[in-house]
Amino acid sequence: CKMSTKEEILSTYRRNINVKEQYDMPDLDALKGVEYSDPVAQFIAMSKAVGGDVVTLERGADVNEAIRKAYPEAKVFTSNVPGITIAQRNPDTVGSAQELNGTDVGIVQGEIGVAENGCVWVPQTMKERAVCFISEYLVILLSRNSIVSNMHQAYSRVRMTSYGYGCFISGPSKTADIAQALVMGAQAARGVTVILTD
């Protein structure tokens, strides 16, 4: 039986791999993340720089009214976040992700905000995570007390839910073609608003 080209390549590759010693991992303690004296202000500035928006919810204000004010033309809201009463759809009770198509505004809970790049860790806390990407606009609720300075700090706080999925979202979807023409909202939300709560 003659070996195929693939088998020959893999056989040669395996014969020539000689890992004789294990190298120590480099000391990463010297790599310190940036620290901001006011992480909330930096988070707001970076969120706007990447095309997002930030609304600071005043104590006692109704988050539903703040969302309606930010998106007055929206008709279909989707959320499973407790206290969101304007949602007509719930990503936990739809039969499939396709039923979320046509969502004007998806509303999700963020866990960690990162000042250095304006991103928010959004763990999957709903059956259909497509709400984060299929919605025309996305609202992320985030406690201002959950904003850290850098990604090192954020990664140390990330905890996975039972769904085993989460993602960092930084502003609206962005893509560029070979001519370097930036397009917002081509693959996911056309706009992202972070609402900072207590």
Predicted segment positions?
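The feature marks the mature, well-folded catalytic cores of soluble enzymes
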Residues: K2-D198
